[in-house]
Amino acid sequence: MDPEAKLRNDAWIGDAVLALFARSWLLQIGQGESSRDRNRLFELWVSNQFLSSFGEPTSVEAAIGRAYTSAGLDAAFMFIEENLVDRFVQTARKRGFNLAVPGRAKNSARS
């Protein structure tokens, strides 16, 4: 398979894994968020604008997809947790969402 096709395939799977993670994560941290707010947060999670803060969005999704195909769903979720969650929380707070995430400082300086 040519590298571009492999990248697209990995990204396609990674996009699905990210969507599953985002929905699960939003339900776990749900603090009375309205369904409208939850939908807006989900859209932010999977947006190219957010993903581009890490690099080219397709490459970010492909990295998630590779974690999934090589080591399974738990590994892919861990990859997202370790690499994307803190910045997502910061981005959401900058947009006016008051996310209280267990185990994370309210105004974390990490990016």
Predicted region positions:
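RNase III-family endoribonuclease catalytic core
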Residues: 1-111
